[in-house]
């Protein structure tokens, strides 16, 4: 057992969206009030991935999740998602993990939190176990936006259907994908639009195929950009990829790590008759972005 008592936020927190933030911020606030260690206790992978061999695509990688949690003032503590852990009863989880391992004094979770083997424990049972083992339990109610509950599954649906602006409202920030720029076929360079090619991490959520207004962060600098996600039908390439053209960047980005923030869906991916038609469309897309943003100002 750790000597310092903890204020623990419980959940998987994929996306660290606005509802998640309320849970984490509540745990951090309780930690500050009582001089506790603020902890976000979560799994390293979705339980369904271990139990059934598949899971919904991840909105955030573990690295991104940890960065977002740290920014809220908490420390992310990972539980290795194993069958032995998932087979624990709710009572065993409370006693062995929350109390004996993390010395819980305060526990915060969402209204629909489940724990223990086959999700046998709910918030009512957690509250009872808190009284038995000596920790307080705070249950955060659901967060509603647009008449619906804010949830990771809802955000995944929005992103995968290209409704980026709606997803970003629920996330409380722009949906983003980070990766190292790799060499592609250099087609963009030959037509005057060199692109930074990033191949997202396996299991990561990708937006619907199409063209998006984006912002790229490189070494702390944020630059306006345009990103195409999909299979590049004009040149017959079937591998899923993400190509970003940054008008103001003339430096070589190969090997550099960048973050692409998705701002707005522009149009679906389509096949052009030739490369000249593709060039004309890219210019139209860029002009459309400029006109849209000038109108907003």
Spans of model-derived segments:
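A short acidic, often aromatic-flanked loop/helix-cap motif at beta-alpha or helix-coil junctions
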Residues: 1, 84-87, 144-148
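Residue-level signal for inorganic ion chemistry
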Residues: 17, 69, 107, 167, ...
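N-terminal catalytic cores of NTP/NDP-binding nucleotidyl/phosphoryl-transfer enzymes
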Residues: 2-61
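Phosphate/ribose-recognition catalytic cores of enzymes acting on nucleotide-derived substrates
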Residues: 184-297
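Glycine-rich, Lys/Arg-enriched anion-binding loops that position phosphate/diphosphate groups
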Residues: 130-230
């Amino acid at each position: 057992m750790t000597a310092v008592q903890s204020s623990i936020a419980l959940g998987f927190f994929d996306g660290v969206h606005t509802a998640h933030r309320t849970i984490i911020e509540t745990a951090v606030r309780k930690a500050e009030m009582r001089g506790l260690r603020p902890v976000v206790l979560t799994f390293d992978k979705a339980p369904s991935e271990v139990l059934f061999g598949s899971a919904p695509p991840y909105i955030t990688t573990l690295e991104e999740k940890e960065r977002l949690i740290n920014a809220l003032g908490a420390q992310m503590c990972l539980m290795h998602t194993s069958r032995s852990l998932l087979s624990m009863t709710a009572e065993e989880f409370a006693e062995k993990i929350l109390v004996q391992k993390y010395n819980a004094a305060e526990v915060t979770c969402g209204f629909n939190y489940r724990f223990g083997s086959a999700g046998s424990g709910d918030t009512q049972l957690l509250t009872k176990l808190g009284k038995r083992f000596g920790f307080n339990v705070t249950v955060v109610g659901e967060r509603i936006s647009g008449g619906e509950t804010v949830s990771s599954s809802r955000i995944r649906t929005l992103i995968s259907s290209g409704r980026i602006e709606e997803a970003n409202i629920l996330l409380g920030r722009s949906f983003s994908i980070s990766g190292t720029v790799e060499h592609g076929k250099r087609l963009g360079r030959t037509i005057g639009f060199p692109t930074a090619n990033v191949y997202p991490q396996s299991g990561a959520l990708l937006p619907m195929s199409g063209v998006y207004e984006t912002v790229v962060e490189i070494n702390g600098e944020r630059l306006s950009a345009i990103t195409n996600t999909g299979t590049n039908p004009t040149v017959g390439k079937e591998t899923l990829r993400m190509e970003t053209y940054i008008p103001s960047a003339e430096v070589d980005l190969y090997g550099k790590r960048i973050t692409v923030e998705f701002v707005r869906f522009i149009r679906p991916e389509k096949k052009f008759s030739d490369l000249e038609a593709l060039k004309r469309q890219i210019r139209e897309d860029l002009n459309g972005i400029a006109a849209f943003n000038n109108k907003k100002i």
